[in-house]
Amino acid sequence: HSEGTFSSDYSKYLDSRRAKDFVQWLMST
């Protein structure tokens, strides 16, 4: 169960990182 919670938290973390990277990329172009 803790593994499932970890993976969902991790995917949320990856999504937020990807969103930040995307915004940075939009700003830089």
UniProtKB/Swiss-Prot annotation:
Disulfide bonds: none annotated. The keyword Secreted applies. GO terms for biological process: adenylate cyclase-modulating G protein-coupled receptor signaling pathway; negative regulation of apoptotic process; positive regulation of insulin secretion involved in cellular response to glucose stimulus; protein kinase A signaling. It holds the Pfam family Hormone_2. One of its GO terms (cellular component) is extracellular space. GO terms for molecular function: glucagon receptor binding; hormone activity. It is found in: Secreted. Keywords: Hormone, Secreted. InterPro entries: Glucagon, Glucagon_GIP_secretin_VIP. It comes from the Eukaryota. Its main location: secreted. Induction: Produced in the A cells of the islets of Langerhans in response to a drop in blood sugar concentration. PANTHER family: GLUCAGON, PRO-GLUCAGON. Glucagon plays a key role in glucose metabolism and homeostasis. Regulates blood glucose by increasing gluconeogenesis and decreasing glycolysis. Belongs to the glucagon family. This is Glucagon.
